[in-house]
Amino acid sequence: MSDGKEELVNRAKLAEQAERYDDMAASMKKVTELGAELSNEERNLLSVAYKNVVGARRSSWRVISSIEQKTEGSEKKQQMAKEYREKVEKELRDICQDVLNLLDKFLIPKAGAAESKVFYLKMKGDYYRYLAEVASGDDRNSVVEKSQQSYQEAFDIAKDKMQPTHPIRLGLALNFSVFFYEILNAPDKACQLAKQAFDDAIAELDTLNEDSYKDSTLIMQLLRDNLTLWTSDAATDDTDANETEGGN
């Protein structure tokens, strides 16, 4: 007999407490495949699970890529690093493809409220962005375009339907600006987008919802930190910008 939804959700929560994010993601994937629209709690569990699963591979990929570049001159070591990087890349691509399939097949079509639609389109932009980080050539052009389209669609809905202080709208602006800075190498556009989102939120601080006050102000701080980083001469290639974690 297949597990019920409640049991799967409880198993995901247990896995989260044990920091076993692969198990957490597997449970939430099954919940999603049951086909019903996810509650806010379920949506956040899914997001946190996959953010951690993919985050571990993104981090590994960066470390191995750096080692690979530093082993020039030692062909054997460089080949070993290259093969290991390709192994991690395959894992990362498979995870991203998993999430994108869930988004296209279940989550985006079932999203009723604007908030849910923006959340999932932002997520789609994020996972195409992660693919862009490890892609090259025509492959990269394709995933970059899909990432930008997803972010832009989410951004248009958010501007029309959500308060500038809403944490999901702010989180979208944060990640979309990181996309411009890191993927498109467009620092001016990244700064403009981040500054506009920050200024719009500041202008409407009185609309801050008590429940999301902490989330909203945290993301505003991250926007400001990125702006400081991006506009300073100290910004270096190996300094990572802030982006939202799962659950925002």
UniProtKB/Swiss-Prot annotation:
Protein's cellular compartments: Cytoplasm; Nucleus
Key words of the record: Cytoplasm, Nucleus
One GO cellular component term: nucleus
One Pfam assignment: 14-3-3
Residues the UniProt record annotates as site (Cleavage): 240-241
GO MF term set: DNA-binding transcription factor binding
Database matches in PROSITE patterns: 1433_1 (PS00796), 1433_2 (PS00797)
Keyword RNA-binding part of the UniProt annotation: no
InterPro entries: 14-3-3 (IPR000308), 14-3-3_CS (IPR023409), 14-3-3_dom_sf (IPR036815), 14-3-3_domain (IPR023410)
A single BP term in Gene Ontology: dauer larval development
Principal location: cytoplasm
Coiled coil stretches, renumbered: none
Domain of life: Eukaryota
Function, as annotated: Required for extension of lifespan by sir-2.1. Required to modulate lifespan, in concert with hcf-1, acting redundantly with 14-3-3-like protein par-5. Promotes nuclear export of yap-1. Negatively regulates the transcriptional activity of daf-16 by sequestering it to the cytoplasm.
Subunit structure comment from the entry: Interacts with daf-16. Interacts with sir-2.1. Interacts with hcf-1.
Similarity remark: Belongs to the 14-3-3 family.
Protein name per Swiss-Prot or TrEMBL: 14-3-3-like protein 2
